[in-house]
Structures are given as C-alpha cells and as structure tokens.
C-alpha cells in the first residue's frame, strides 16, 4: 500500500508541475499578445507630394484603418497634380478610396508651391503618375462635412498639407466640424526650427490664416511638429536602397523621393525627412509616441519675419497664470521613437 501511495503521490506532483508549466506558458503567450488596434475612420487631407504619398500608402496598408476619402488641395503642387498623385498612391496601395478636390489657392488667394523640393509633379519627376481613376466630382469641403455629419464623433482628419480645406469646412459649418473626433496636423516647427523660414514650417506658411482658424475652432487638434522628423527619424541612402529592394510599393516610394534626396544632397545631407509618414505613424501606432504636451497654440498671420510662426504656451510653465487664462487648444507630440520609424514603415508595406 505504501508503494502504491508513493506512486500516486509522485504522479500527482508530476501532473501539478506539468499543469503549472502549461499555465505559465499560456500566461506568457497571453502577455506576449498585443491588443488589436481599434478600427479607425479617417479622412486624409493632403497636398500630395512624395512624403504625403508615402503616408497615404502607409494608411492604406494598415488593416484597422478605413480611409473614408482623401481630400486634396494646392501646396507642394497644384490642385490637379495633387489629385493625380493621391489617386496613384491609393492605386499602388490597393485602395479604392475616393479623392476629392478642394482649395486651388490659400485663404489669401495665393499659391505657395514646392517644385524645387519635390519636382514639378511632386513625385520626383520619375514618370510615376498615370492613375487609372479620376477624382470624384464632389467638392472636398462638402465631402468632409457630409462625412463628419454621417459619423459624428468617429471621424479623424489627418491633415498632412496646409489647413485651407479644413478652415473652409469650419467657416461653412462650424457646429458639424466640432463633431470631428480629432484633427491630426503635420505642421508647425514644434519646439524646433522651421523649414519655410527660421520660425515657420511649410504647411503653416502656405496658409497661416487657415491654420489659425483651425487652432481657434474648438476642435480637438493634435500636432506633430517638424522637430519630430529630424535626426534619427531621417531616412538614409542605405534605407532607401532597402526600401527599393522590398517590393513594388517600396520601389514606388523610393523613386518618388529622388528629387527630395537631390535637394537634401545639395545642402550637404545624405539623409532626408519624411515628415508626413512620420505623422501618420504617430496617428496609427500610439506606442510610437513617447510623450505629449498640453499647449495653447497661437499662429501669427501677419507678414514679416515671424509670419506663420506657431507659438506654444505649455501648460504648467511660469506664464500659465490665472491672468493669462489660456485655452489649451492643442496636444503637441513631444517625443517619438525615432529609431524605430523606418523599420515600422517597412513592416507596414511588406
């Protein structure tokens, strides 16, 4: 009997060890699993140059993202070219989202383009643009307002160009626009220097009046500034070669940056910023953002040396007083995981 009891005892011990091991493995497996990203309804508002195009492709290749439409405007290129570039990016990414034309000039009736940076077609002048589809007949502003009204509190507008279309939508129907879940803006210098002037970033400089309207609208705005796109976030020549050798999508993106790379090389830099795809990464992958700041953002619209500068009054600083009574109208991205940016983009388009 003692022998049998011993056998039973050891069998129970062995079973318990096995079960505890299985439980541990299961717990480790569960811990290793990431929660699926939530479904996102987005409108991409863009002046489609090479970096905008790469951002559209990133969004279209991200499974949990529903692109409700792409609204285009003048900026890097003229309005018609912006539409064709967006259509081509969607085609390359396998998306049938509609493209809607908006502003052909900024709020002051001017056009500020970037042919010298991105090429005359905005896509490196590499012969890439021959879309099979055409833009929709509905106006971009009408589309924005109709879509926000259809999905109140759900639509996120990802603004990777000047704010002209958004400002026009706010002017036309401010109450509907307040039902926007979030406007994500690739714009401003953040807390660093500018690229259109020492104090201004191109998207804001192209239409500071519209940018001010957006900031003052009462809509939730999160800003990804130019300062997030520098340093380790810049794409190197070696990384462009890797991108080109990945697949057809990667080759398209790499070729579209040829003029921009020439522009940077002329200024002594082998690596380039891809600001719009970095902004899109912030939007789509929350873990990429390491810190944010609550701020009051104020845009200068007057002509002069400070035109289009956006000043950020950060919450908790000495000027944060009862007398100032700031409306903290923006969330400013303060830090991102720059070193992971390129690999995250590469994984998304594979």
Which residues does each PLM region occupy?
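Bacterial N-terminal signal peptides that target proteins for export
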Residues: 1-9
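Bacterial signal peptide processing site
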Residues: 23-25
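Conformational coupling and interaction surfaces
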Residues: 29-40, 58-67, 205, 209, ...
């Amino acid at each position: 009997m003692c022998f049998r009891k011993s056998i039973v005892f050891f069998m129970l011990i062995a079973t318990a060890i096995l079960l505890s091991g299985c439980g541990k493995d299961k717990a480790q497996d569960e811990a290793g699993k990431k929660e699926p990203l939530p479904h996102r309804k987005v409108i991409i508002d863009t002046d489609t140059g090479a970096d905008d195009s790469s951002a559209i492709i990133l969004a279209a290749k991200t499974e949990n993202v529903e692109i409700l439409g792409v609204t285009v405007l003048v900026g890097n290129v003229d309005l018609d070219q912006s539409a064709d570039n967006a259509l081509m990016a969607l085609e390359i990414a396998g998306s049938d989202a509609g493209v809607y034309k908006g502003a052909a000039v900024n709020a002051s009736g001017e056009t500020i383009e970037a042919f010298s940076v991105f090429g005359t077609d905005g896509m490196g002048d590499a012969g890439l643009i021959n879309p099979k589809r055409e833009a929709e007949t509905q106006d971009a502003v009408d589309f924005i307002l109709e879509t926000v009204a259809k999905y109140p509190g759900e639509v996120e507008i990802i603004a990777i160009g000047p704010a002209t279309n958004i400002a026009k939508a706010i002017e036309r129907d401010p109450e509907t626009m307040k039902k926007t879940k979030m406007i994500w803006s690739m714009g401003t210098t953040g807390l660093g220097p500018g690229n259109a002037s020492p104090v201004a970033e191109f998207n804001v400089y192209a239409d500071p009046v519209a940018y001010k309207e957006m900031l003052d609208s009462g809509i939730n705005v999160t800003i990804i500034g130019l300062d997030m796109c520098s340093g380790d976030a810049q794409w190197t020549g070696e990384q462009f070669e890797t991108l080109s050798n990945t697949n057809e999508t990667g080759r398209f993106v790499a070729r579209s940056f040829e003029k921009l790379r020439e522009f940077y090389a002329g200024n002594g830099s082998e690596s380039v910023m891809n600001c719009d795809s970095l902004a899109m990464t912030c939007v789509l992958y929350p873990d990429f953002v390491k810190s944010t700041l609550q701020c009051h953002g104020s845009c200068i619209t007057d002509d002069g040396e400070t035109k289009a500068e956006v000043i950020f009054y950060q919450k908790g600083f000495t000027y944060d007083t009862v007398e100032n009574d700031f409306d903290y109208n923006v969330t400013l991205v303060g830090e991102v995981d720059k070193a992971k940016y390129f690999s995250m983009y590469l994984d998304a388009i594979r």
